[in-house]
Curated annotation (Swiss-Prot):
Keyword annotations: Calcium, Ion channel, Ion transport, Membrane, Transmembrane, Transmembrane helix, Transport
Primary location class: membrane
Organism of derivation: Arabidopsis thaliana (Mouse-ear cress)
GO cellular component annotations of the record: membrane
Residue stretches spanning the membrane: 7-27, 101-121, 158-178, 375-395, 427-447, 467-487, 512-532, 584-604, 626-646, 651-671
Annotated protein name in UniProt: Hyperosmolality-gated Ca2+ permeable channel 1.4
Keyword DNA repair: no
Keyword Membrane: yes
Residue span of region Disordered: 738-778
Comp. bias regions, Low complexity: 753-763
GO molecular function, one term: calcium-activated cation channel activity
Length: 778
């Protein structure tokens, strides 16, 4: 059981760690040779040039301006100066909405902390429930006198906690509603003012039914010319190019090694570099490194060419899917948001993700296999969550000196040392839990990829959902349950079964001390480590020394990174959960959470302005997930408070808390119906307005040229295939086209407008269909 002294030691360690990280960052960021590490965003935008290109040698390495060291903390006010509209233009709406999550934390928990400390803390402190609990062998510490555990069983003081639960809920719901309304308006405004992008006109069609007489490309073209004759423009079929992508990736790796050895040779021309041919280059025959990698690259180039030819000729490489582009956003919206045929399992349409956020390997997965894959991952996630309770129990065993002494008496001489005791209880559990969770986001992302999601945003949102569930079940509930068992081990073993719920009711708020230590490790030192950027700093200088030859190489060596939504958002949600659960129970935890939200907002705002470069823009599409999880945390806090109050002899409060949970769920349904459509549906009115304005501004826009290669697989956009682009044939000069099928069972033809004829198929740079004068290619 962590005491006030233990928490003080943990706070000292984490504050010192955070200050060291911040000091190192403040000094390193102003050194010229680190400029690309701490300001890569501005280099990518082309508004910042390298300071190491001019001046004396020493000034290229070290900042000799003494005044800059005096102003080394200027990054803090600078991070707050940029107004939100400018931030959206600079970094995108996703980044701005992400920052608002931290602001919501401050808006919610600031007033809640004020109320709880002014009302609940005096109520708890002036009670003497823990004195009575000690008679039942319940372990506690002085800090627990600030919690609900100190209120006597059956006391009327619990009505104060009930009233505060209502106040906290109403305030949280008010803040959430205002934010939902604000962000929905920001999203619609952003989409309306956004520049023209291919995904605004494009729909992904999946589960295209096979036809024995027509290819997939011909089938897609025929279907949309018939059913969307006035709006269909062009399409690109989806190819299984995963093997080709692997070859291209291998070639890039070989090229990197060749560049490295060429640079090494230019620095020492007296001896050509050699490499061993054995496993990992540890043993085997030595050969000339440059000759070896040159030969490997030539070999891979031939394999890539052969694989491309195979894909051209093999119909099995064509998946039952296509990207279909339309002449207007309105036409794309109608197609994406409607059912295409009476069979709901065929011709499935959805908005195409932004081209740069496509996860191309998953497009090659057969659509029918996705259900099986997702079921398998549900089972795998269940077992991952279930078995992770073992390390959680280990962490909680560290958090309890009493539990260690009872289960391992031989360690008593060590843990009885005051400094060691404070270190074990106040710092070690939080850092061990943090280490156990390091690889979890990566594992969950791999599971999401296996499920077959086709966009990075959908992958991240699924992984984030699972991470949130994992935190809820293991990090929160698992820590409370296992920790209570360890700390109250003697009570659990000696008392009757009827008394165990009462002991748990007292022990749950006592676990606040463990979560305080975890918040300091993860939310204080962890956030400070984020701005320090140790890993990108080391990697950049290694690349700069071994691989960089030109300014382009130096730019590629930069690693600006991005906001990993799947890893960061669930962590934030854990703080919302802890804050809402413990606000009416143990208010002492709230200042630690408020400091986290304020500090993280400052750090991540700086990173978004100067460092991060997002790979895609979803216009804040993830906000409904954020809102829903905060509501879930609110309902969980009410249910846990209900259980706690019932164990404390206040069963009559149960109806009031049940009503509160029902009201909270009703509020969620209201927000879902009122605001969520802005995040999942593109209003036809907005699409028509944008189309009309675009036609007025650019009456001669060649939209087909803009769209025809937008969704070609990246491996087909290699410079070596530039000659393939010449294979694209246009039929814009036709005034009328007869859409004629190749089916032997049907001789019907469909006359389409001349506008539709301009939408002739543009499958890929190497698979085109020329309609000519209405005669299909044979």
């Amino acid at each position: 059981m962590a005491t006030l002294a233990d928490i003080g030691l943990a706070a000292a360690i984490n504050i010192l760690s955070a200050l060291i990280f911040l000091l190192l960052f403040a000094i390193l960021r102003i050194q010229p040779f680190n400029d690309r590490v701490y300001f890569p965003k501005w280099y990518l935008k082309g508004v910042r040039s390298s300071p190491v290109n001019s001046g004396a040698f020493v000034s290229k390495i070290m900042n000799l301006d003494f005044r800059s060291y005096v102003r080394f903390l200027n990054w803090m006010p600078d991070a707050l100066k940029m107004p939100e509209p400018e931030l959206i233009d600079h970094a995108g709406l996703d980044s701005a909405v992400y920052l608002r999550i931290y602001l919501i934390g401050l808006k919610i928990f600031g007033p809640i902390a004020l109320l709880s400390w002014s009302i609940l803390v005096p109520v708890n402190w002036t009670s003497d429930g823990l004195q009575l609990a000690k008679l039942r062998n319940v372990t506690s510490s002085n800090i627990d006198k600030l919690s609900i555990s100190n209120v006597e069983r059956g006391s009327d003081r619990f009505w104060a906690h009930l009233v505060m639960a209502y106040a906290f809920t109403f305030w949280t719901c008010y803040v959430l509603m205002k934010e939902y309304e604000k962000i929905a308006a920001m999203r619609l405004s952003f989409l309306q003012s956004e520049k023209r992008r291919a995904d605004q006109f494009t729909v992904l069609v999946r589960n295209v039914p096979p036809d024995s007489d027509e290819s997939i490309s011909e089938n897609v073209q025929h279907f949309f010319l018939v059913n969307h004759p006035d709006h269909y423009l062009t399409h690109q079929v989806v190819y299984n190019a995963n093997e080709l992508a692997k070859l291209v990736e291998d070639k890039k790796k070989m090229q990197n090694w060749l560049d490295y050895y060429q640079l090494k040779y230019t620095r020492n021309k007296e001896q050509r570099p050699r490499v061993k041919m054995g496993f990992l280059g540890l043993w085997g025959k030595k050969v000339d490194a440059m000759d070896h990698y040159t030969a490997e690259i030539e070999k891979l180039s031939e394999q890539i060419m052969e694989e491309r030819k195979r894909i051209k000729k093999d119909d099995k490489s064509v998946m039952q899917a296509a990207f279909v582009s339309f002449k207007t956003r309105w036409g794309a919206a109608v197609c994406a948001q409607t059912q295409q045929t009476k069979n709901p399992t065929e011709w499935l349409t959805e908005w195409a993700p932004e081209a740069r956020e496509m996860y191309w390997p998953n497009l090659a997965m057969p659509y029918v296999s996705l259900t099986v894959r997702r079921f398998v991952m549900h089972i795998a996630f269940f077992f991952l969550t279930f078995f992770f309770i073992i390390p959680i129990a280990f962490v909680q065993s560290l958090a309890s000196i009493e539990g260690i002494e009872k289960s391992a008496p031989f360690l008593s001489p060590i843990v009885k040392n005051k400094l060691m005791k404070s270190l074990i209880q106040g710092f070690l559990p939080g850092i061990v839990l943090k280490l156990f969770l390091i690889f979890l986001p990566t594992i969950l992302m791999i599971m999401s990829k296996f499920e077959g999601f086709i966009s990075i945003s959908s992958l991240e949102r699924r992984a984030a959902f699972r991470y949130y569930i994992f935190n809820l079940v293991n990090v929160f509930l698992g820590s409370v349950i296992t920790g209570s068992a360890f700390e109250q081990l003697d009570s659990f073993l000696k008392q009757s079964a009827n008394d165990i719920p009462r002991t748990v009711g007292v022990a749950i708020p006592i676990k606040a001390t463990f979560f305080i230590t975890y918040i300091m490790v993860d939310g204080w030192a962890g956030v400070a480590g984020e701005i320090f950027r140790l890993k990108p700093l080391v990697i950049f200088h290694l690349k700069n020394f071994f691989f960089v030859k030109t300014e382009k190489d130096r730019e590629e060596a930069m690693d600006p990174g991005q906001i990993d939504f799947y890893a960061t958002e669930p962590r934030i949600q854990l703080y919302f959960l802890l804050g809402l659960v413990y606000a009416p129970v143990t208010p002492v935890l709230l200042p630690f959470i408020i400091f986290f939200f304020g500090f993280a907002y400052l750090v991540f705002r700086h990173q978004i302005i100067n460092v991060y470069n997002q790979k895609y823009e979803s216009a804040g599409a993830f906000w409904p997930d954020v809102h829903g999880r905060i509501i879930s945390a609110l309902i969980i806090s009410q249910i846990l408070l209900l259980g706690l109050m019932s164990t404390k002899g206040k069963v009559q409060s149960t109806p009031f808390l049940l009503v509160l949970a029902i009201l909270t769920f009703g509020f969620h349904r209201f927000c879902k119906g009122r605001y969520e459509s802005a995040f999942v549906i593109n209003p036809l009115q907005e699409a028509m307005i944008k189309d009309t304005l675009e036609r007025a501004r650019e009456p001669n826009l060649n939209l087909k040229g803009f769209l025809q290669n937008a969704y070609v697989h990246p491996v087909f956009k290699d410079e070596e295939d530039s000659d393939e682009e010449g294979l694209i044939e246009d039929s814009d000069d036709e005034d009328c086209v007869v859409v004629q099928t190749k089916r032997q069972r049907s001789r019907r033809t469909t006359v389409a407008s001349s506008n539709a004829s301009r939408g002739s198929s543009q499958s890929t740079p190497f698979n085109q269909l020329d309609l000519g004068k209405g005669k299909p290619e044979t």
